[in-house]
Amino acid sequence: MAPKKKWSKGKVKDKAQHATVFDKSIIDRINKEVPAFKFISVSVLVDRMKINGSLARIAIRDLAERGVIQKVDQHSKQAIYTRAAASA
């Protein structure tokens, strides 16, 4: 009979040190980099910009209102955006 398998300790994830308030540098980075992303969602901004979810939602809402990005699909919780098509 095979020996009893030991329980693994599991992986420990470090606590994210994401920004919780907007400052000038974060706003500038969002305005410069996000319109170039092909796929834009709250989780993408949290991952790439190192901001928390509420800031990501505010940033996406602001960019959409200004017409910099456009909505592709809206799930019950997650909205998906893409860069705005170049006006021809």
From Swiss-Prot:
GO terms for molecular function: structural constituent of ribosome. InterPro entries: Ribosomal_eS25. Its main location: cytoplasm. It holds the Pfam family Ribosomal_S25. It is found in: Cytoplasm. GO terms for cellular component: cytoplasmic stress granule; cytosol; cytosolic small ribosomal subunit. GO terms for biological process: cytoplasmic translation. Keywords: Cytoplasm, Ribonucleoprotein, Ribosomal protein. PANTHER family: 40S RIBOSOMAL PROTEIN S25 (PTHR12850). Belongs to the eukaryotic ribosomal protein eS25 family. Component of the ribosome, a large ribonucleoprotein complex responsible for the synthesis of proteins in the cell. The small ribosomal subunit (SSU) binds messenger RNAs (mRNAs) and translates the encoded message by selecting cognate aminoacyl-transfer RNA (tRNA) molecules. The large subunit (LSU) contains the ribosomal catalytic site termed the peptidyl transferase center (PTC), which catalyzes the formation of peptide bonds, thereby polymerizing the amino acids delivered by tRNAs into a polypeptide chain. There are 2 genes for eS25 in S.pombe. Component of the small ribosomal subunit (SSU). Mature yeast ribosomes consist of a small (40S) and a large (60S) subunit. The 40S small subunit contains 1 molecule of ribosomal RNA (18S rRNA) and at least 33 different proteins. The large 60S subunit contains 3 rRNA molecules (25S, 5.8S and 5S rRNA) and at least 46 different proteins. This is Small ribosomal subunit protein eS25B. It comes from Schizosaccharomyces pombe (strain 972 / ATCC 24843) (Fission yeast). The lineage of its organism: Eukaryota, Fungi, Dikarya, Ascomycota, Taphrinomycotina.
